[in-house]
Amino acid sequence: SLAYIIFFCWKLDMTKRMQWLWRIVIAMLITCLISISAIALQPGNAAISPLPDPYLTTGKLAEGEKVFKDYLKNNDKDDKARFGLGVIQFMSGTERLMQSLYRYGMIQNPAGGSIPFFRLPVPTNPKPQTLTYDGLQQVFQGWIDDLATVRTTLEPIKDQNLKLALRLGLIRLDFDGNGKADDKEMLWQLFNAVTGARVTEKDAQQFLIAFDRGDALWLQGYTHVLGAMGEFLRAYDSRELFAACAHLFFQNVDTPHKFLLIRPKKTDEYYFNIFDPLDLVTAVHLAKFPLVEPQRMTTILNHMKSVISLSRESWKSILAETDSDREWVPNPKQLSVIPQVRVTDEMVKSWLKFLDEIALILDGKKNIPFWRDEKLSINFAKIFTEPRPFDLVSWVQGTAATPYLEKGNTTDARVWNEMVNAFGSNLFGFVVWFN
């Protein structure tokens, strides 16, 4: 017993007594440390929550994803770690998409400016693989699957006090798939390439965002936005368009029209390929796709409904905030990390009305105006619940809308006018930001 040991030590001379006492103290400390370690390692006990920054800023996304998954196995209620994993997974999915586009030699073509997938600043690949139609569809499906993974991770988050500080601009992605993410593959460089901005590395280091639960819902909503786009590309068969126009966006494509792969040499910085306008006209003409997977159209409708639901929930969370801490999407009483941008009460009120109006349209309870007859309107929801082959020219002309025309309740123009008045000339930018 401890009393016996102390009595034994006390019978010794002073020098030996101190030596024995030190041995006893050290032995007790070691025993305590072993016991504490054993308890900490037992399943269900708290551990130190990992942070995503060390993995995001070094480009070690796969390692980070494994660390977070292992941690969450025994700490699944840690919403901060869950949010961190969701961010890592979103960045991993973006990285995989860019690597796929690089592998097939994507070309930076202004014609692809309206297609989000083709706006990514993918480096030029000196030895690209040949892209087939099925190969491109696999790229789109991989992106859809990655977004679904992020959604599954983010959905359980409930902590209203959640806070995750990140320097987004310093995140590194391995664009070209060479196994390392260098300085040229940082997000602030990508932002400059996509937007034409002049952000410096110093700016990126100072751009610290404190993401909260409202932002977690915001990101979850964006996985639905991007997922809907991917589902549309998979719902229709666009092989004919691919064969005639894929060369506009990729260096080597599997096409029966081999002459399309012969590219005139650029003579100067003002070079203009006279065949590009002809190819674009052809692209419009061939934007006529058979419907091959109609169930994906229903999925698109569900994605859009989820965007509305999550935006409502996000704004409920944002409006409940009382702090003002490096906000990504602020309420009217907070300051945003985005310079010289303020959110007003009028903006929020008009946005929430807009969400209600869009929800009615997606439920088929309100229609959108028909541009060729003001007495008729289009049941927008039916386009997805009763899908048909897609024909761009026929939609512009109006005949493609015929199966969906009704004398129904049309959307309230006042809601849309309020939006324009509240947001002004920056309406589109705010819509993209607010989600």
Predicted regions and their residues:
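Bacterial N-terminal signal peptides
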Residues: 24-37
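Boundary at the C-terminal end of the N-terminal hydrophobic targeting segment
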Residues: 38-40, 46
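Short coil/linker segments at helix-helix boundaries
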Residues: 48-50, 55-66, 90-418, 428
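Residue-level recognition of tetratricopeptide repeat
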Residues: 78-79
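Alpha-solenoid helical repeat scaffolds
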Residues: 83-84
